[in-house]
Amino acid sequence: MAIGNLDWTQRGGALTLTERWGLTLAAIRKHVNLRRQARPDGASRLANTLDRLGLRALDQIEHPWDALAFAASTAAQELQPQWLTHHCWRTYAWGTLLAVNADLKYDKSLFFSACMLHDLGLTSHAAAPNDHCFTLRGARAAGDILRSAGASETQAHCVAQAITLHLNLDVGVEQGVEAHLVQAGAGLDVVGQRSQEVPALLRQAVVDKHPRLSFKHQFCSCMQNESRNTPQSRTGLYVRRLGFLDLVRQAPFDE
């Protein structure tokens, strides 16, 4: 059973010893990659589609206006603090730009909905036990919101699984392109993962439109609280053992 998928999270998101070791080794590899990415010679990266498009790439970030997207964005605005909702918008922007670079095809409405609601479990509006992983709490709440807006079970499952998977260190496209992009977008915004793939001009434009509002401080506080409540979860491992909060603070953003 894959870590982070919906079936796996039904046990509350607690890691087995084997899973903890596997994630620890993966985190070490990820940390090495982030350090390499931060080196000055990273500026000499190969040109990509976003370089060629320049600011025109921002046109791709236009969000969908169907019933599911409207329900997700409305819920995000009403149920989340502003700093967290801006993070959700940036997650969507980064994921969209990375998809342009990789020429990935996906369901834009479901991807957008998952981005808007992927951290809903960090708020008090996610109805599930506090000792369960916040991604499970958020996935359940998101499913209810989208079903109320007319989502099919297949659509609700896609969004919910993208939410529970996004806390993994990597999500392959074979696990769902939408899930892959949510994790990629959130990873870029939180720790700077793959930020070198997005030209500085585009990064600044996204942050100007959706300001960070002391994101690092706010997010680290949430993660510390989550790790105390769910010490056996992925968050508990990342925060207590793997230096996750330091990676957040070192991300290539001012706040």
Predicted feature residues:
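Active-site flanking loop/helix segments enriched in acidic
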Residues: 57, 68-87, 92-96, 121-126
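Short linear elements at protein peripheries
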Residues: 48, 52, 56-72
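Short coil-to-beta-strand
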Residues: 61-68, 106-116
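Generic alpha-helical secondary structure signal
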Residues: 66-70, 74, 82, 153-157, ...
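Short pre-active-site segment immediately N-terminal to the catalytic Zn-binding motif
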Residues: 100-108, 126-127
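Divalent metal-dependent catalytic cores for phosphoryl transfer on phosphate-bearing substrates
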Residues: 110-209
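Divalent metal-dependent phosphate-bond-processing catalytic cores, especially two-metal-ion Mg2+/Mn2+ enzymes
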Residues: 1-54, 81-89, 93-104, 151, ...
